[in-house]
Amino acid sequence: MRRFIQWCTVIGLLLGLVPLAQAQGSYPDRPIRFVVAFPPGGATDTFFRLISNELGTALGQSIVIENKGGAGGYIAWQMVAAAPADGYTVLVAENAIGINQALFKKHPSGFNPLKDYDAVGAMGSVPVVWTVANNVPANSFPEFVQWSKTVPGHFNYGHAGPGSVSHLVPEVILDGAGMQAVPVPFKGGGPAAQAVAGGFVAVVVSSLAVAKPQMEGKLVKGLLVTSAKRSPAIPEVPTLKELGIKVADVDLEFWWGLFVPKGSPEPIRAKIEKALQATMSNPVVRDRLAKVDTDPSYAPGPALTAKLEREITNWSKFIDAKGIKVEQ
């Protein structure tokens, strides 16, 4: 009798695994929601829309992009972390997810990207551009530094929210150039970029993909790019090295990766990763990204996790050294 009960238990467990295996085998059988933690028009939204069609083709399913801005990214990050771990809700993250962790240390919500997510893969990076409003009387970065001395501590820069790339990268450049400024938060990189174009703030650091069309339209002036050498997309803009600005050892760029809720089935995570790898090696995608000097570099999940860990460590050193704090 005892053996009979044991066999029934085993059979019950095996039968319970059948629907799960079938679900994993048929994945994806409905549209997949990819969540961007910032409003349309920002760096992450712009980048992902450049690759989303090909990623959907590689997955064999439609992609639905959902922009869920607010709280510097935390609303979306927590929402996706709490979603069912079934592969149908994926986070499109930028390095702000690591910078925030370095800035806030322990968020009141308890959110921690290393504990709450499984990394799918890295999918590219792009340098950022120091863009200034047309009403700022400077046409080069040295001229901008000289102008800043006439308004010490009083010029402002817009950013996408506390802990965002456009919040902390300017602080690194300001530190290296010996300037001070007042940060002005917006609800995303798109609104911040619109603000500098309208002359409402003096500076915004934008991804090259966002800055280039603004520069071509004479809406802003690009005075500095954070790439190691001049970008072919904006060859007239000098680099930090050319300008003699020494900065902290942090990534002065946007980089992106896909994450799924912790505990997502490995076969499903692997399918998304395989589709991402195929997308980033697609010649059409690579050519499209090259036009905005975006490196379509793919890296697997473990490499993305390691990159996120380094990001948190390096930014923590800079933030702690400079005593940067933001009210939570």
Predicted regions and their residues:
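Hinge/capping helix and adjacent helix->loop/strand transition within the periplasmic-binding protein
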Residues: 79-88, 101-191, 240-242, 255-288
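C-terminal lobe and pocket-closing loops
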Residues: 125, 211-281, 313, 327
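Short secondary-structure boundary segments
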Residues: 94-95, 134, 207-209, 227-228, ...
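Bacterial N-terminal signal peptides
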Residues: 7-19
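An extracytoplasmic/periplasmic, membrane-proximal ligand-sensing/linker region
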Residues: 29-31, 175-179, 242, 266-328
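Residue-level signature of catalytic and energy-coupling elements of molecular machines
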Residues: 144, 196, 315
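Positively charged n-region of N-terminal signal peptides that target proteins for export
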Residues: 1-4
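N-terminal (or domain-start) structured segment
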Residues: 23-116, 153-154, 162, 166, ...
